A protein has these predicted regions:
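N-terminal, charged/glycine-rich beta-strand/loop interface patches
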Residues: 56-60, 83, 90
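Distinct, well-ordered alpha-helical segments
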Residues: 81-88, 109-117, 136-140, 168-171, ...
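Conserved C-terminal portion of the radical SAM core fold
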Residues: 139-258
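Non-catalytic positions within long, well-ordered alpha-helices that form the structural scaffold/packing
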Residues: 60-62, 117, 176
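Core AdoMet radical
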Residues: 38-50, 63-79, 93-108, 119-140, ...
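Radical SAM enzyme core and accessory elements
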Residues: 1-3, 263
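Short, charged beta->alpha transition segments
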Residues: 52-60, 110-113, 140-144
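Canonical Radical SAM [4Fe-4S] cluster-binding loop centered on the CxxxCxxC motif
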Residues: 4-50
């Protein structure tokens, strides 16, 4: 970690009083590294939306005392009214809860940002898709800039490709100037499918393929070579440049360990 770290990241490591809810696995993006199609019930959840408000209410009735909740997908903002209702209900059921939203920015505008803030949203995490071209990147950066000053903590969360170190350094500097609170750098993972896209990009596994000896509720994958080194280089860069933005590295091992605790 370099600088600020989201309290949600700290809670995620042990899964204490923290839960993430999936409204839908449907998404307008087609990221080659996406884990979601590897979910056991992907076909059944792709359309959505799931009744995440009812799930929250069930957890409250069971005696849960949640301090961190998140809404993810897919793209939760394909269903904006339901997303707002989720955060409103989370605040009612668990006063003071830290809430966060994961989004590509699809369907987001100033009016929806204001509604989300009014519903109690604490943190929003945007993904920047480096392979979608300059125009798409500028569009999401504009949304990120609009979110700064509306949502208390604005973040970017994205996997790091080993050959995009230069781009990522420029992005960190730009996000820092925009007033973005933090960046969560993810170790790129192979999602156990879509292998032809990884071959086309000359991406290789970090180690020899191995059988995952755990029944993960969230089907993750195997780490890709070079991504961790690039993430660590970006951490050093942020410190050496004195950037104010918080930079956090989340390895595939960290994701797996956190899930073991949660399950």
């Amino acid at each position: 970690v370099s600088g600020w770290q989201s309290p949600a990241c700290e809670a995620c490591r042990l899964g204490l009083h923290a839960e993430t809810y999936v409204m839908t696995l449907a998404c307008p993006r087609r990221c080659f590294f996406c884990f979601n199609p590897n979910q056991a019930d992907f076909d059944g959840r792709a359309a959505g939306p799931r009744d995440v408000v009812r799930q929250l209410e069930a957890r409250a009735r069971s005696g849960a005392h949640l301090r961190h909740v998140a809404l993810t997908g897919g793209e939760p903002l394909l269903h904006p009214d339901e997303a707002v209702a989720f955060f409103e209900r989370a605040w009612e059921l668990f006063p003071g809860v830290h809430s966060r939203l994961y989004t590509s920015g699809a369907g987001l505008d100033g009016a929806l940002l204001t509604r989300l803030r009014g519903a109690g949203l604490s943190e929003i995490r945007f993904s920047v898709k480096t392979d979608e071209g300059a125009v798409a990147i500028e569009e999401v950066l504009a949304l990120i800039g609009e979110a700064v000053g509306v949502i208390p903590d604005v973040m970017v969360e994205m996997p790091v490709m080993s050959d995009e170190l230069g781009f990522m350094k420029e992005l960190l500097v730009r996000l820092d100037r925009m007033g973005v609170r933090g960046v969560n750098l993810l170790e790129l993972g192979f999602p156990l499918f879509n292998g032809e896209e990884f071959v086309r990009r000359d991406l290789k596994l970090k180690g020899e393929p191995y059988r995952v000896l755990y029944d993960y509720a969230y089907a993750a994958g195997l780490p890709v070579a070079g991504s961790e080194e690039a993430c660590l280089a970006l951490l050093r860069f942020a410190r050496e440049e004195g950037l104010s933005i918080g930079v956090h590295y989340c390895s595939m091992e960290n994701k797996h360990t956190g899930q073991v605790y949660r399950q």
